């Protein structure tokens, strides 16, 4: 097979097939390979006329069909299948060639793979791709890591297929080795928080205010005309308006209330813990999904018949209208906190791993193609560009003002929910994070005293430098300098 393709895709399931078609739609000559040739044939039979494809029956044929320096994008199952395919390609490729892992890989795996492959003279790029199957076909948000040299080759290819926001392609070089997959991981963590906050808003209106799904869908439609304008708010309205054709009931009332997850939210929280970065909103969103899936535990709790309010707020029409606005304000404030925490995790990791990540550019490429695309990402990008958000997004004047405007509503929502038995872990944890930041003194002083008591971990004093330890077991409990 002669070398004619400028890019290739390995793995032609939903995401890989859609990405290959997107590449072909934009003038790329695309080599395609799947372990089972039947899937390759299916792609060619159904979509072969959409562009220039070069189907390969073997991996050797696939590599031979690529113009040097070769670029192969793999979209296979995470874990061992990914490692196996990377190794197989590396054995057939030459120094200067590029292997791109566009799946949802855990960033330490990407760092490990990049180190191994680069030692052989090849380039390895971990690239986060957001937008699902539709995004892969019509234009995703792309977050490639890897070397600057590999980016020179990939830039025109990726810019041709990425989503566009205000005319700009939603792709940028994130940083070295695992930076791309790290940023995609945090993107997904923010997505978890965003979805949980929306779900809590729905629950407050459904159970608290007794509104129908269609009525709540109307509210979300109106909210999408405000600063909350986003993909997730938009699709929430559509889901809530959907009527089940079999029963005539709202579809949301027939969906089992167990929220699944694939692991990226968990990775975000685990990594934040290892970096000592509080991502409370994201963590509570992950835990809320876990609780939703504890079917036996929840069923037993129902049998226990615990005392407590039933969630009904019993508000009159004017109070109801005002509380819906409170929920909107609380949702926006909590959303700001989620993004602030996510960007803080990126900043901390960049220092830890030596990545030079342009946070303004990250915000810009999230404006289109990805699941968390939202109007206010323009504000976030501007805040980082100006330097106003260098310490925290919350300190940028626009977001500081938004938080202050929403504060009373935010507190009212969390307080009413607690008093009436409605769980709002994401709202409440976001508010607590905000209050923790604004507190001049935290009870951590007591915790450090306890740690010194049982473990001689020492403490610092507010009135003099140094580390100290109290001799707790001795009668006089003298303090010594450690």
What positions do the PLM features span?
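Small-residue-rich helix-loop
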Residues: 222, 350-383
């Amino acid at each position: 097979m002669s070398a004619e393709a400028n890019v290739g895709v390995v793995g032609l399931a939903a995401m890989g097939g859609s990405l290959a078609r997107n590449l072909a739609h934009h003038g790329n000559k695309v080599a395609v390979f799947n372990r089972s040739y039947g899937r390759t044939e299916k792609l060619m039979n159904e979509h072969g006329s959409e562009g220039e494809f070069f189907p390969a029956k073997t991996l050797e044929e696939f590599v031979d069909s690529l113009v040097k320096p070769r670029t192969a994008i793999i979209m296979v199952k995470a874990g061992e299948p990914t490692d196996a395919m990377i190794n197989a390609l590396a054995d057939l490729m030459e120094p200067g060639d590029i292997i791109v892992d566009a799946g949802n890989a855990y960033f330490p795996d990407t760092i490990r793979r990049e180190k191994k492959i680069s030692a052989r003279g090849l380039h390895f790029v971990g690239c986060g791709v957001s937008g699902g199957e539709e995004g892969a076909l019509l234009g995703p948000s792309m977050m490639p890591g890897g070397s600057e040299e590999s980016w020179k080759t990939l830039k025109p290819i990726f810019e041709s297929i990425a989503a566009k926001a205000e005319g700009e392609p939603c792709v940028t070089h994130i940083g070295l080795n695992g930076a791309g997959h790290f940023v995609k991981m945090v993107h997904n963590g923010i997505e978890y928080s965003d979805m949980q906050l929306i779900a809590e808003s729905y629950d407050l209106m459904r159970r608290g205010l007794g509104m129908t799904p269609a009525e709540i869908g109307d509210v979300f439609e109106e909210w999408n005309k405000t600063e909350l304008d986003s993909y997730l708010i938009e699709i929430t309205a559509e889901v809530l308006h959907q009527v089940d054709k079999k029963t005539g009931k709202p579809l949301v009332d027939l969906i089992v209330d167990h929220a699944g997850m694939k692991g990226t939210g968990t990775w975000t929280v685990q990594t934040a813990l290892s970096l000592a970065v509080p991502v409370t909103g994201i963590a509570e969103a992950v835990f809320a999904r876990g609780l939703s899936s504890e079917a036996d535990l929840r069923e037993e709790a129902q049998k226990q018949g615990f005392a407590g309010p039933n969630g009904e707020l019993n508000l009159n029409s004017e109070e109801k209208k005002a509380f819906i606005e409170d929920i909107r304000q609380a949702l926006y404030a909590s959303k700001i906190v989620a993004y602030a925490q996510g960007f803080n995790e990126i900043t901390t990791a960049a220092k830890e791993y030596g990545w030079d990540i342009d946070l303004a550019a990250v915000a810009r490429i999230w404006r289109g193609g990805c699941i968390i695309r939202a109007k206010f990402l323009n504000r976030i990008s501007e805040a980082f560009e100006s330097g106003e958000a260098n310490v925290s997004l919350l300190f940028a004047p626009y977001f500081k003002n938004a938080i202050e405007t929403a504060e009373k509503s935010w507190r009212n929502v969390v307080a009413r929910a607690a008093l009436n038995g409605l769980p709002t872990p994401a709202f409440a944890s976001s508010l607590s994070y905000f209050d923790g930041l604004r507190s001049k003194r935290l009870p951590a002083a007591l915790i450090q005293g306890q740690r010194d008591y049982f473990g001689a971990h020492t403490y610092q004093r507010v009135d003099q430098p140094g580390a100290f330890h109290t001799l707790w077991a001795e009668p006089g409990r003298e303090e010594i300098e450690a």
